[in-house]
């Protein structure tokens, strides 16, 4: 099936990522972060999971997007929000007590998580006529109405994004900047929690991160999409760019993340700044580096096979 710009029962998260409705690339670099930083990030992640359960039960936890933790840490650091700290036993890790940190940013991120997941489920229904996902989405109707009344701007932006990306795929849009910009516009509105003095910088940060996410996803799926003849705007790039796609994409990705980081550095964030910088300057590149290693291994394997023949 065709892939929409940037794509979460059982494989909900995977399907969300394939559609670009969760990020999949915004994570910490474990090797470069202190133990204290890792514990804090995990506590916010556990808090998001607990909040989703509080909002709509176990089904909410099934829609958990790990990447939304970044948004929680960002908003917590910017607004210096106090945490409600609780110890609990996790069903997946029952051997020792876990710690969850929850604040108003957690509640906001959980709401955005549910809206994105809802649209993924509806999209699955439209594409595949999956009655399981239609039924799952139906169970979120009450939550959708609640969140829409609370955050009409953000929900409206996500709805507009879903409509526009459908049109883009249908018409096989070749303008990469235009297509990536759609994800940027949507993420910009999600990052902008409140219309206040920080709104412009948060929007700018979200816009460039959204474009980065879209391009990284298109780059990761390039070979598969070309082979299966699925929509991917990278297949339309000029011949000279296509000859060295890795370098060209790296330059574009670096440019986008540079703009994102500039906006971050203009925000007066001290709390968790180490975690956020770890993600922005290192963690977001983890998948790219993994893909490079994977490509080199495939090339080496092909050379060995050719040499044997």
Predicted regions and their residues:
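Single conserved hydrophobic/aromatic residue that forms the stacking wall/gate
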Residues: 1-13
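Acidic catalytic motifs of isoprenoid enzymes
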Residues: 14-204, 211, 215-246, 250-252, ...
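An active-site-proximal "capping" alpha-helix that borders the catalytic cofactor pocket
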Residues: 256, 260
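Short, highly charged C-terminal tails/helix-capping segments
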Residues: 279-280
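Conserved, well-structured core segments
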Residues: 302, 308-309
């Amino acid at each position: 099936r065709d892939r929409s710009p940037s794509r979460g029962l059982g494989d909900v998260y995977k399907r969300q990522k394939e559609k670009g409705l969760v990020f999949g690339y915004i994570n910490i670099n474990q090797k470069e972060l202190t133990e204290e930083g890792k514990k804090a990030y995990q506590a916010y992640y556990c808090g998001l999971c607990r909040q989703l359960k509080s909002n709509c039960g176990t089904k909410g936890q099934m829609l958990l997007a790990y990447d939304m933790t970044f948004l929680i840490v960002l908003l917590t650091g910017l607004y210096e929000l106090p945490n409600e700290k609780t110890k609990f036993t996790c069903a997946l890790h029952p051997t020792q007590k876990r710690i969850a940190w929850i604040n108003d940013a957690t509640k906001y991120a959980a709401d955005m998580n549910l809206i994105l997941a809802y649209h993924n489920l509806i999209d699955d229904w439209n594409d595949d006529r999956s009655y399981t996902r239609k039924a799952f989405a139906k169970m979120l109707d009450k939550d959708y109405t609640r969140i829409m009344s609370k955050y009409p701007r953000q929900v409206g932006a996500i709805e507009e994004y879903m409509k526009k990306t459908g049109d883009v795929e249908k018409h096989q849009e070749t303008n990469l900047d235009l297509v990536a910009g759609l994800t940027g516009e949507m993420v910009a509105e999600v990052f902008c929690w409140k219309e206040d003095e920080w709104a412009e910088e948060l929007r700018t940060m979200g816009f460039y991160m959204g474009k980065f996410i879209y391009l990284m996803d298109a780059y990761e799926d390039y070979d598969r999409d070309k082979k299966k003849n699925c929509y991917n705007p990278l297949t339309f790039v000029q011949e000279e760019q296509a000859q060295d796609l890795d370098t060209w994409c790296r330059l574009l990705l670096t440019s986008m993340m540079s703009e994102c980081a500039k906006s971050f550095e203009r925000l007066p964030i001290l709390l968790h700044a180490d975690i956020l910088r770890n993600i922005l300057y290192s963690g977001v590149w983890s998948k790219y580096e993994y893909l490079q290693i994977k490509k080199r291994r495939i090339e080496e394997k092909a050379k060995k096979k050719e040499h044997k023949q």
